[in-house]
């Protein structure tokens, strides 16, 4: 497993941020790695036929061609064109989960008027996709996995840099107020989260180099590990992913580390 600073699971951080206000005067948040001239020189050219150039998603530096109406999209894909937003497909049972896997579609933004290029049926589908996401956001029964997906939609970017640092400040505030419910977490991934919070709270007080890569435990709603684990990168390069045993978080022997999908399900297929 890569030796990077480990950070806490995002669902837990999101829950903390809803419970306690962020400490005033918190240290500066971690930033995306700067787009140096050397990095920009490595960017592939945008095709001349591209109708609209879009800024990169997340911490990327290279401009991309904006996605058109109806194109597949997600958290890690290029951005949708102006007037469009990336939404889960109508009827998708796990909208946020689908968006983290690039299984959404570019549709008209809720406030955007329909255009002549969009048929009546397409317009209704676009509205249905928006409605499904709105209903999910209002549901009081959001699971921890959905909260994880929700955070990935707010992954660190040049527009949203304070999320991680503010969450750590929130934890420090809880500690100062002697809120000790954190110690009730018993499952393996949950225990790791608590230890990581302790380390991050301490690291917050120290000055040093910027952190551009870190591993964040990917926990399920029961407090165990998802079989697929990935590092998070703030330098524009895709992080490594690998496969683990859900009950321990230990890497599966012989499994690959890749910047794509390691296909962890292959190690759990039951042979008949």
UniProtKB/Swiss-Prot annotation:
Residues 132-143 have a biased composition (Acidic residues). Residues 115-143 are annotated as: Disordered. It is found in: Secreted. A motif (Cell attachment site) lies at residues 259-261. The modification Phosphothreonine is found at residue 170. The modification Phosphotyrosine is found at residue 171. CDD domains: TY. Transmembrane segments: none annotated. One of its GO terms (molecular function) is insulin-like growth factor I binding. One of its GO terms (cellular component) is Golgi apparatus. The modification Phosphoserine is found at residues 139, 157, 169, 255. Keywords: Disulfide bond, Growth factor binding, Phosphoprotein, Secreted, Signal. Binds equally well IGF1 and IGF2. Interacts with integrin ITGA5:ITGB1. Interacts with VHL; this interaction inhibits HIF1A degradation. Multifunctional protein that plays a critical role in regulating the availability of IGFs such as IGF1 and IGF2 to their receptors and thereby regulates IGF-mediated cellular processes including cell migration, proliferation, differentiation or apoptosis in a cell-type specific manner. Also plays a positive role in cell migration by interacting with integrin ITGA5:ITGB1 through its RGD motif. Mechanistically, binding to integrins leads to activation of focal adhesion kinase/PTK2 and stimulation of the mitogen-activated protein kinase (MAPK) pathway. This is Insulin-like growth factor-binding protein 1. It comes from Rattus norvegicus. The lineage of its organism: Eukaryota, Metazoa, Chordata, Craniata, Vertebrata. The gene is Igfbp1.
């Amino acid at each position: 497993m890569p030796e990077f600073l480990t950070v806490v699971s995002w669902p837990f951080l999101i829950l903390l941020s809803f419970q306690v206000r962020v400490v005033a005067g918190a240290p500066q948040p971690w930033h995306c790695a700067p787009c140096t001239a050397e990095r920009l020189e490595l960017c592939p050219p945008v095709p001349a036929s591209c109708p609209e150039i879009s800024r990169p998603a997340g911490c990327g530096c290279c401009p991309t061609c904006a996605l058109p109406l109806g194109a597949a999209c997600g958290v890690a894909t290029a951005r949708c064109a102006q007037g469009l937003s990336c939404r889960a497909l109508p009827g998708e049972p796990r909208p946020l989960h689908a968006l983290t896997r690039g299984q959404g579609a570019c549709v008209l933004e809720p406030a955007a008027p329909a255009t002549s290029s969009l048929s009546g049926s397409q317009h209704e589908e676009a509205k249905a996709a928006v409605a499904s996401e709105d209903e999910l956001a209002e549901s009081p029964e959001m699971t921890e996995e959905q909260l994880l997906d929700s955070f990935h939609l707010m992954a660190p970017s040049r527009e949203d840099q304070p999320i991680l640092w503010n969450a750590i400040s929130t934890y420090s505030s809880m500690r100062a107020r002697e809120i000790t419910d954190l110690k009730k977490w018993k499952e393996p991934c949950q225990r790791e989260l608590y230890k990581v919070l302790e380390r991050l709270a301490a690291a917050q007080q120290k000055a040093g180099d910027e952190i551009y890569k870190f591993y964040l435990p990917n926990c399920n709603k029961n407090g165990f590990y998802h079989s697929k684990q990935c590092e998070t990168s703030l330098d524009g390069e895709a992080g490594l992913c690998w496969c683990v045993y859900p009950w321990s978080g230990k890497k599966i022997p012989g499994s690959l580390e890749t910047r794509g999908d390691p296909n962890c399900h292959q190690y759990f297929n039951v042979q008949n």
